[in-house]
Amino acid sequence: MVVALRYVWPLLLCSPCLLIQIPEEYEGHHVMEPPVITEQSPRRLVVFPTDDISLKCEASGKPEVQFRWTRDGVHFKPKEELGVTVYQSPHSGSFTITGNNSNFAQRFQGIYRCFASNKLGTAMSHEIRLMAEGAPKWPKETVKPVEVEEGESVVLPCNPPPSAEPLRIYWMNSKILHIKQDERVTMGQNGNLYFANVLTSDNHSDYICHAHFPGTRTIIQKEPIDLRVKATNSMIDRKPRLLFPTNSSSHLVALQGQPLVLECIAEGFPTPTIKWLRPSGPMPADRVTYQNHNKTLQLLKVGEEDDGEYRCLAENSLGSARHAYYVTVEAAPYWLHKPQSHLYGPGETARLDCQVQGRPQPEVTWRINGIPVEELAKDQKYRIQRGALILSNVQPSDTMVTQCEARNRHGLLLANAYIYVVQLPAKILTADNQTYMAVQGSTAYLLCKAFGAPVPSVQWLDEDGTTVLQDERFFPYANGTLGIRDLQANDTGRYFCLAANDQNNVTIMANLKVKDATQITQGPRSTIEKKGSRVTFTCQASFDPSLQPSITWRGDGRDLQELGDSDKYFIEDGRLVIHSLDYSDQGNYSCVASTELDVVESRAQLLVVGSPGPVPRLVLSDLHLLTQSQVRVSWSPAEDHNAPIEKYDIEFEDKEMAPEKWYSLGKVPGNQTSTTLKLSPYVHYTFRVTAINKYGPGEPSPVSETVVTPEAAPEKNPVDVKGEGNETTNMVITWKPLRWMDWNAPQVQYRVQWRPQGTRGPWQEQIVSDPFLVVSNTSTFVPYEIKVQAVNSQGKGPEPQVTIGYSGEDYPQAIPELEGIEILNSSAVLVKWRPVDLAQVKGHLRGYNVTYWREGSQRKHSKRHIHKDHVVVPANTTSVILSGLRPYSSYHLEVQAFNGRGSGPASEFTFSTPEGVPGHPEALHLECQSNTSLLLRWQPPLSHNGVLTGYVLSYHPLDEGGKGQLSFNLRDPELRTHNLTDLSPHLRYRFQLQATTKEGPGEAIVREGGTMALSGISDFGNISATAGENYSVVSWVPKEGQCNFRFHILFKALGEEKGGASLSPQYVSYNQSSYTQWDLQPDTDYEIHLFKERMFRHQMAVKTNGTGRVRLPPAGFATEGWFIGFVSAIILLLLVLLILCFIKRSKGGKYSVKDKEDTQVDSEARPMKDETFGEYRSLESDNEEKAFGSSQPSLNGDIKPLGSDDSLADYGGSVDVQFNEDGSFIGQYSGKKEKEAAGGNDSSGATSPINPAVALE
């Protein structure tokens, strides 16, 4: 058995004795038990007629207990009494008296006591007082009418019959309606009804006192009292007088722990009010209540500190009356130390302590087996000393039951306690060989519950038989438990408990295992987070590997768990994530790491911050100040949500003029909760207040009541007054209208005045509602003095300021006179002109419009492409720099003055920009010629910016960091290719090409590459095959710059039916990009083999479509050899003629390149799209936008069936094309791609849709 010591706590006893009873585990010994009273009736019983009376007395004990009763100290035998029934139960002496009339119940009145005895002693019950009460009756009496004059006091008596049980008194009328009670009319604790002063409305003849007796469940009533009030015309005021109590002071005794009720009822006119005072100290506010309109003071649970004087003070306008209560706090007897029953072994000393307290001090008496000690023989060996009964050297014959009884005038206490002397062998009640587990640093408790008589001594030994108490960490308890504090790993082992008395000794073994303590290695950290965000707490802990670990989370002491219907909490792997933080989430969060042996906790605090809460309350005060357009606003502070409130924003809304729009009246510091506001006349103000902290504004407060300020004349005039004409013969006067909150009345209008400037004549005026006025029939551009004044039903606004306005403008007639144009550089000029005559402007000179456009290049036949640019120059400036111009271009320039009406006539001028450096060449490509040579192809720049004089080509190996750079000046501007030789096949190069004018080289285009990447192992790229019913197309993507080569394609049918038949291998050129094989069989699988230089390079599979073999038509003459030879001869002849034609064309018909360029479309109007392959980049920018805008038609055309055609017609050109047997080039290759280059090397071909000329502009 393993015992975890997590919840084992020791039982501490103050003396070496056992528990009150023999433990149930102590088996095999038949031990007797002294009698013990287990149940008895209350100390006081009140019975009523026809009630049954039950007197209970039950007790336990071995041997069986015998019962006897006494009544008023005389032996009482219930079995012999008529009408008494005794319970037939082994442990009960209870009996019941069956009542049928009041006399029968009264015959059994008295003080009863029960005695329970066996051979070990006698136990005694407390005194049971039985009281009989008859049916309540109101004594016969004659009630005379009560006559009193209006304003006097009166007391209506009740005087109910006496009762042993508390009564409830009610005053009602004959209609069973309660008499209304207030400060003037009050019922006292004694049941009387007190009138401080009577009114004529109190005149009734049916004041009835009802008494409710809860014991008998009956209500009886007094004869009605007739109260007759005599009316009077002059009620006399009088000072208060106490009706109860009637004297000036009283002395009361209050019982400790019971409630205290004090009462003062006064009369007088006007009706007095009651106050309560305590001169000796403050009232205990937490225990005092005031009832019955302050006439009754009730003090709950009276204590000794409540002793002293209490005063009631009755006051009205004529004086006061008072009464002093002097309260003495006393107490019924109560236990300080109650005697306890114990078992003792022979020779021990027995001591029973009976310590009581009370006020007055209780008298203590002792009994032994129910007999007072004074009546016992004097040779008894007990002694009574300081409230204790002591017996020395007890023996089994000294077994007894004692009674300690304490009484004073407020009550009685009784306690039974036995001294049981017995001899029992020692026995350890704790199981043997238990295993206990605890963690290092904690305290372990090894149990050894022993029992015997005399009480066995308990000793703990280690495995060596040595007492463990030599180590100060080991400590014993009186109940035999061994405690070991500050456990260490080497405390693991076996321990032995030895219990012994004078009869025997016994031993058990306990096993202790000490485990590693749980430790939190990384606990959660306190943090401050914003509302609505999420927070993550982490927790890591180390555990003993043999224990079951657990990490849980707690928030403010409550366990946290993930909720199935909410994602508020996420708990996993020592992490607690709280989503959507709210202010209710702030608090202390704990990581609890636990095993079955220990628990450790690490705590962190979470503060949730955010904008403030709403202002809870808003109050307007000083409303009389509204006549002065002021009001005071007060509010309760808002919740700051852990961030100090920086300010309060006071806003208002006018539901009449601008509903649902709020305006700020100002802000006050955050520590201020009221302010006086300056208001505007005639505004319907509804206020609200918003708190603001560093996280922003909170929710606004509830809105206030609406207040309206009185009307007044306007305090402001419109602003931004202007006079401008929208026609040449008028002037439009405009202004910014007043805000509605500045109207100071329900409506506002504007008084507009005007007159020509410089005249002293009368003002013309007009009152309008709109924020403008049109003055007609004016001269062109004449200045006027203008005033605009606000007016309403209460008067005019302040005297307005005079504003100068002008009538309508006309178009300017002034022409700017150019002073000259200064060429700053090839792309910028400075334009200057003289100021215009303002009289000719016909209005306000707003500035100058400078318009310019490029008419074309200075080169011949350059096409005009007009794109106008505009620059607006301020009126006080007469020059402008035009930048961003195209070099070597002709420009047209216009300058116009303009006013508010428009622009005047223009002055014109033309100028030209000088030459500049050209742009970068277009489309630089590298083509492999051999392992050591490359062919560079390019296009001229789109922007010549002058006359091209040639190109500068430079290159260097990349691996040498720019060393060994070579440069070539290519003087021919028409050059488009250049062949580089003697290159290393193992290096990559950086090539840079620049076009030049007389101003020098321009931007460069850069390309990197080498022969190594272009002339290596043949690469078919992305090769694929598709099939139809009787054909298949093989396609591939030629690698850019790859040297051309020829290879074989072989189709081989698969399957037994096909017999593995192969078609003749076909010779194909790499630059073809595709090959179509015809004459295939439908629904057939084929293998495709690619060979180069008799070496296998690639293989793929394809399957044709269809469902059967294709039937070939009968062979005709087209398949005969003679026909094939004839056709071949014709084709060869045509090819020779075509070659001769190209040679002749290349040698003759040449013309100026410049003339040719000038015949082409302007490069800006129709730029050419580069159709060559490869990439390039500028030295200035790798991502410069290209100027190509149009596309060329495809040069490939439809795919031509190749079959076994080896014709070179597709590779014709101005140079010879020869192949080795393997299909590789012998000479320079200039295939279809060469045809696409416009104006190639030594080419003079005409412009055509597939050979467009390159635009040089």
Curated annotation (Swiss-Prot):
Q: At which residues is glycosylation annotated?
A: 100, 203, 247, 294, 433, 479, 490, 505, 588, 671, 726, 777, 825, 849, 876, 979, 1022, 1030, 1071, 1105
Question: What Gene3D superfamilies does this protein's entry cite?
Answer: Immunoglobulins
Q: Where is the composition biased (Polar residues)?
A: 1241-1250
Classify the main location.
membrane
Report the transmembrane regions from the record.
1121-1143
Write down which residues bear the modification named Phosphoserine.
S1163, S1178, S1181, S1194, S1243, S1244, S1248
A cellular component term (GO) from this record? axonal growth cone
- Keyword Isomerase, does the record have it? no
Q: Impact of mutating S1194L?
A: In HYCX and MASA
- Indicate the impact reported for I179S: In HYCX and MASA
Q: What is the effect of changing D202Y?
A: In MASA; loss of homophilic interactions at the cell surface; no effect on localization at the cell surface
Q: Which CDD domains match?
A: FN3, Ig3_L1-CAM, Ig4_L1-CAM_like, IgI_2_L1-CAM_like
Q: Which GO terms describe its molecular function?
A: axon guidance receptor activity; protein domain specific binding
Which keywords accompany this UniProt record?
Answer: Cell adhesion, Cell membrane, Cell projection, Developmental protein, Differentiation, Disease variant, Disulfide bond, Glycoprotein, Hereditary spastic paraplegia, Hirschsprung disease, Immunoglobulin domain, Intellectual disability, Membrane, Neurodegeneration, Neurogenesis, Phosphoprotein, Repeat, Signal, Transmembrane, Transmembrane helix
Where is the protein found, in the record's own terms? Cell membrane; Cell projection, Growth cone; Cell projection, Axon; Cell projection, Dendrite
Q: What is the effect of changing L313P?
A: Found in L1 syndrome; likely pathogenic
**Consequence the record notes for mutating W276R:** Found in L1 syndrome; likely pathogenic
Where the record annotates domain Ig-like C2-type, the positions are 35-125, 139-226, 240-328, 333-420, 425-507, 518-607
Location of the region described as Disordered in the Swiss-Prot/TrEMBL record: 698-725, 1176-1207, 1226-1257
Q: Biological process GO terms, please?
A: axon development; axon guidance; cell adhesion; cell migration; cell-matrix adhesion; chemotaxis; homophilic cell adhesion via plasma membrane adhesion molecules; nervous system development
Could you say what the effect of mutating P240L is? Answer: In HYCX and ACCPX
Q: How does it sit in the membrane?
A: Single-pass type I membrane protein
Of which family is this protein a member?
A: Belongs to the immunoglobulin superfamily. L1/neurofascin/NgCAM family.
**Record note on quaternary structure:** Interacts with SHTN1; the interaction occurs in axonal growth cones. Interacts with isoform 2 of BSG.
> What's this protein's name?
Neural cell adhesion molecule L1
The primary gene name is: L1CAM
